[in-house]
Amino acid sequence: MKTIITLALLFLINIVGAQTIKSIDDLEPSEAFDNIQVQKIDSDSLSTTFAIWVKLKVKMHKHVNHIENVYIIEGNGEFTVSDSTYKVRKGDLIVIPKDTWHGVKVSSKKPMKVISIQSPEFKGLDRVFKED
């Protein structure tokens, strides 16, 4: 019986410890930056979540093995996905299939702040930048 109770407690501790709650309003760049600042919020084998601030642009690139969901918290600009360009602003969600070229040009005075969720876990190994 002790074994069952111990296993149950360990299971509950693991579940509770695996959850993360962050206030989006409290996320701020950790230091001064020229163009892009990235903060990892959470990661496991299934996905990685980042807070990203962009002052000017993110060059066209793709993730060979990852899908990416980008939710705009602040700012606006032009987001290109494949051959289409969209005007984007606070509250927009961009869904980017794996192996799809994408990038953004910021037009707001304040940096664009986004939440980026990539699946599976992002380790930076499959990001390919498009040559100019």
Model-identified regions with their sequence ranges:
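Structural motif
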Residues: 57, 76-78, 85, 101, ...
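Sec-dependent signal peptide recognition
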Residues: 1-8
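Short, conserved beta-strand element in jelly-roll/cupin
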Residues: 53-55, 64-79, 117
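Ligand-binding loop in jelly-roll beta-barrel domains
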Residues: 100-124
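A short, N-terminal "cap"/entry segment at the start of jelly-roll beta-barrel domains
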Residues: 5, 15-51, 59, 129-132
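Short acidic-glycine-tyrosine-enriched beta hairpin
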Residues: 84-98
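Short histidine-centered beta-strand/loop micro-motifs
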Residues: 52, 59-64, 105-107
